[in-house]
Amino acid sequence: MSSNASHRELAEAWLSEDPDPVTADELRRLLAACDAGDPAALADLTERFTGSLEFGTAGLRGILGAGPQRMNRVLVRKVTAGLAAYLVASADDARPRGVVIGHDARRNSRVFAEDTARVLGGAGLKVFLAHRPWPTPTTAWAVTDLGACAGVMVTASHNPPAYNGYKVYWGNGAQIIPPHDTGIAAAIAKIGRSDQLAMPALDELRRAGSVVDLTEELHERYLAKVVELRASPGIDGRSLVIAYTPLHGVGALSVERGLLLAGFPQVHT
């Protein structure tokens, strides 16, 4: 079998389990271009279906698109299934302690977060799901505050808009370190088709108490802890005018509210 033929078979198998009409259509168009003999399309197909994005201490990060070398719903579901298997194998109380899931405002971040919640819930793990986009440190802090066994943050941090990512935090609120990264990667490698995973609807999981939506109450507690850490609490900030830009990030609400709680009411974003 030629390399092109094997990559095409991998692509067709991927297409058969892709739940996202956008990436499915993208892959169909790529295959059509390959059939027409487009050398750039053939090279693109080969790159997308040679190996996969590697899971490490920083989790996953890649360009959005179809195929295992891109960030997409198929990959997120498989990675989450591997994470769930590793957590359950690592701790007897992983299921009741649960996993915190946060996300930023990038393209597909909410969808990836909800898919993550459904896969974890289907594996019997309790899920604490952010109700809106929020900064990464909020997720890490929530892991320790809620006593969860892990946290997932859907974000690509400073990368350009075409990217998205998937960060994992351990029960201590810190980004995972060895041997957890390789253990999770090994568990991911054992996962089969993503469309065969147990993925109850979110509403069903909410009714069962398996998914709990995290509201502004948790965010307020987080900001209160942040304000406690200010270096000079005696400063009168009422007359100080502050301009802030989130630079396309999700920090605006946190910064505005945090500064207000710290005594700096004149914040412009």
What residue ranges belong to the model's regions?
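Ferredoxin-reductase
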Residues: 14, 18, 94-171
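Glycine-rich phosphate/diphosphate-binding loops that line cofactor/substrate pockets in enzymes
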Residues: 79-99, 230-238
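Cofactor-/ligand-binding subdomain signature composed of acidic, glycine-rich
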Residues: 2-78, 190-197
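Phosphate/oxyanion-binding active-site loops and adjacent basic polyanion-contact surfaces
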Residues: 71-81, 131, 135, 215-225
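Glycine-rich phosphate/diphosphate-binding loop of Rossmann-like nucleotide-binding domains
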Residues: 73-80, 102-122, 240-269
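Gly-rich Lys/Arg/Thr-decorated short loops/hinges at beta-loop-alpha junctions or inter-strand turns
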Residues: 54-70, 97-100, 118-122, 195-214, ...
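Short, glycine-/Ser/Thr-/acidic-enriched flexible segments
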Residues: 60-62, 67-69, 106, 134-135, ...
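Gly/Ser/Thr-enriched, mixed-charge loops and adjacent short helices
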Residues: 14, 18-22, 44-53, 164-269
